[in-house]
Structures are given as structure tokens and as C-alpha cells.
Amino acid sequence: MTTIKLYKHFFILFSLTILLGCGKPDTSQLIDKALEAEHRTPSYVQRDKYRHPKETLLFFGLDPEQSIIEITPGYGWYTEILAPLIRNKGQYSYTSLRLHEKINPFFVKLESAFKEKMEKNPDIYDQLRWVHFNPKQPEFAPN
């Protein structure tokens, strides 16, 4: 090989290496940003040291372009982290345990509080999608 061809191959490999480094932001950094966001409930932030959300999400291979379904999100501890993480390129869906024949008052209260919280922050939660979930027929992720 001539020196010019070697330089050409080196330049191509070097350019590809640089381009690979210019990809999407590191998921770890995006999780850090979500964990430090101002919209998070202060008492939930305090829980992070016990629940280890960053480590958990990295362990499960979270990707900001994924579709996520959170079953019964409670008052939204994980939602505060997940929703902004996947807001632009992924899809966040949540379910509640509303049953056809009987609705437990606790779950009605929980769902109402969750929805109210989401409505107060449309800049973060406007892309959320509610999916009906019946534990007796657990099909909630059509295609």
C-alpha cells in the first residue's frame, strides 16, 4: 500500500471514530439530569439514596427511545424520572387498576392524585399515555 492510501484509510477510520463519539447522549448522563430536575418532589429526591434509581434503570438497560409501560405508578416517583427521560424519542404509558365491576377507593384516590400531578406539569408530562389495564385480562400493550 502506498503512503497516500494508508493516510486515506487512517483518515476514514479516524473520522468514523469521531462520529461514533458524537452519537446520542450517554443514558447515564440523561438519568443524572432527570434525577436533578426541579420538577421532582423533594421527598422523592430524598428516597433516591435508598432506591438507587440510576443503578436500577441502567441495570434494566433503559434507552431514551424505548416504549415504557409503568403498571400502577402510584404517586409518580418513577414517573418523575422516566417521563422526561423518554419524552422526546420514546413513549411512556401508564396503567391503573381500574376494574370493570369494582373500583377500590384507594386506587381511585391514587389515580386522581397522579393525574392531577401530571396536569400541573404539562411541559414534562404532556406526552404520557394512559392504557387500560384489567388484571383479569392483562393485555395492555397492543403492537
How does the language model describe each region?
Residues 138-143:
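A short acidic, Gly/Pro-enriched loop at the edge of an enzyme's catalytic core
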Residues 65-74:
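Conserved class I S-adenosyl-L-methionine
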Residues 23-25:
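Bacterial signal peptide processing site
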Residues 75-88:
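Conserved SAM-binding loop of SAM-dependent methyltransferases across substrates and taxa
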Residues 30-59, 63:
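Class I SAM-dependent methyltransferase Rossmann-like catalytic core
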Residues 123-136:
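Conserved SAM-binding strand-loop segment of SAM-dependent methyltransferases
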Residues 19-21:
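C-terminal motif of bacterial Sec signal peptides marking the signal peptidase cleavage site
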Residues 2-11:
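Bacterial N-terminal signal peptides that target proteins for export
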